A protein has these predicted regions:
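C-terminal boundary and immediately downstream tail of ABC-type ATPase nucleotide-binding domains
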Residues: 228, 238-260
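ABC family nucleotide-binding domain
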Residues: 3-237
Length: 260
């Protein structure tokens, strides 16, 4: 396998608060990377930085043949990025599909319309072609019978599966998941994780921010434990989750696994 995603010395601050201090890691094509850590540790900011939804202060992100050195991304006098930089960020975003914590579906569009929005509007794909593929993707996530329903007519788990289909519609190199089950009722979590497990089995490259330790143990090729904007510990789940070496990782997992 070859390295598909490379992150080098990523840093990001919001005012005086440094969320990411110095993050570096790599992910090989066809593998699943799970990111765990306490609230406020920088997990979501890291994920959003990979497709430039957040612009890091410095650091380099490479996905496939697209590399962005964020130290060179500098707004012009009116706060607008130069055209070449906007195009570079757009090229990076095109390499990934994002599945959000709270679905982020367009409420006035059907499930199918949500799925084909990106390919048609952003990528210029013909509506007929995008529709055929959109229906295939909804079938892929078990929602072929719900293509014409609006988000308010779907359960939270169904909405999240529409979100997964939408992320896949752009044919991304890597799929980014930001706590995809944290907003769901417990009985709906299994359906979403089932889709994610099948995607992993099919060889999709996935980077997943999650608190689902069992999923990480079963599916992840590597786990990153992040705290204080740093990668404190990384490795296969058999090491990081089952046999953590760093005291911060041990303390976090102990709290997470404590009986209620």
């Amino acid at each position: 396998m070859s390295t598909l995603v490379t992150v080098e010395h990523l840093a990001k601050s919001f005012g005086d608060h440094q969320v990411l201090q110095d993050i570096s890691f790599g992910a090989e094509a066809g593998t699943v990377t799970c990111i765990i850590g306490p609230s406020g540790s920088g997990k979501t900011t890291l994920l959003r930085s990979l497709n430039a939804l957040e612009i890091p202060d410095r650091g380099i992100v490479t996905i496939g043949d697209c590399t962005v050195d964020f130290a060179t991304i500098t707004p012009g006098p009116r706060g607008r990025l130069p055209k070449a930089q906007r195009e570079l960020l757009a090229a990076l975003r095109a390499k990934s599909g994002m599945v959000y914590q709270s679905h982020n579906l367009f409420p006035h569009k059907t499930a199918l319309e949500n799925v084909i929005e990106g390919p048609v509007v952003v990528q210029g794909e013909a509506v007929a072609e995008a529709t055929v593929r959109g229906r295939e993707l909804l079938e892929r996530v078990g929602l072929s019978a719900h293509a014409d329903k609006y988000p308010f007519q779907l359960s939270g788990g169904q909405q999240q599966r529409v979100g997964i289909a939408r992320a896949l519609a752009g044919r991304p190199s890597v799929v980014l998941f930001d706590e995809p089950t944290s907003a769901l009722d417990p009985e709906l979590v299994g359906d979403v994780l089932g889709v994610m497990k099948s995607l992993a089995a099919e060889g999709w490259t996935m980077i997943v921010v999650t608190h689902e330790l069992r999923f990480a143990q079963q599916v992840a090729d590597q786990v990153l434990f992040i705290d204080g904007g740093l990668v404190v510990e990384s490795g296969p789940p058999s090491e990081v989750i089952a046999n953590p070496q760093h005291p911060r990782t041990q303390a976090f997992l102990t709290r997470l696994l404590e009986p209620i």
